[in-house]
Design a protein with these regions (language model features):
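P-loop NTP-binding core
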Residues: 1-4, 8-204
């Protein structure tokens, strides 16, 4: 109970599905302007998350699809990055610019930053175009960066339920989108175990 009061005071909400959330709204877009003249503006989020260390085993930072100061803050605070890319032309084209930003943040601000992989999302396998984009991304980046085997399928209903404050697991736990995220979770956990095994081996 004491911990719940502590996190509530920080604007963190406990969701019935078993996770804590710090939700944002449209007002967050104004932070881009506010951060322009802020001291250590690239690491403000990291400084805040440092105060939460020990309370959580994992913290996920969901970024808006832009390369502004908020995204830079997220990259400066993170140790791993999963890059979601819609199976469409423009998002795929913008991937190279995002990768350049990630590498720049790694060089200048956060040397521990690593890319876990690229995740294909909103994939409509009924169209040849989506299949071609997916194949192109795997061919272009697969030799340098892991492209997750999991693909998150397109779902109109998945978009709608986010407005209801529910997750896909609460709405349709046996559906294709939920199955996709379950498979992604397994891939990420496997990566974590491989890293842990590698660290243990290097210590020995």
């Amino acid at each position: 109970r004491q911990r719940q009061m502590r996190i509530r005071d920080r604007g963190i909400l406990h969701h019935p599905e078993g996770v804590d959330l710090m939700p944002a709204d449209i007002q967050l877009s104004g932070m881009e302007v506010s951060l322009v003249n802020a001291m250590s503006r690239e690491t403000i989020l990291r400084q805040y998350l440092d105060t939460l260390k020990g309370q959580y085993s994992h913290i996920l930072i969901d970024c808006q699809p832009s390369l502004g100061m908020l995204t830079v803050n997220a990259l400066a605070a993170a140790n791993r990055v999963i890059i979601p890319v819609q199976a469409e032309y423009l998002p795929a084209k913008g991937l190279e610019q995002l990768l350049q930003t990630v590498n720049k943040v790694k060089r200048q601000i956060n040397p521990k930053l690593q890319i876990d992989g690229i995740l294909l999302t909103m994939v409509d396998n009924r169209t040849n175009f989506a299949k071609e984009i997916a194949a192109l991304l795997r061919e272009t980046y697969g030799s340098k960066i892991k492209v997750f085997g999991t693909e998150i399928p397109h779902s109109v209903r998945a978009k709608e339920i986010s407005a209801e404050g529910k997750s896909i697991f609460a709405h349709d736990p046996n559906g294709k989108v939920a199955e996709g995220y379950k498979n992604l979770t397994k891939e990420v956990i496997k990566l974590e175990k491989q890293r842990e095994k590698s660290r243990t081996g290097s210590i020995r």
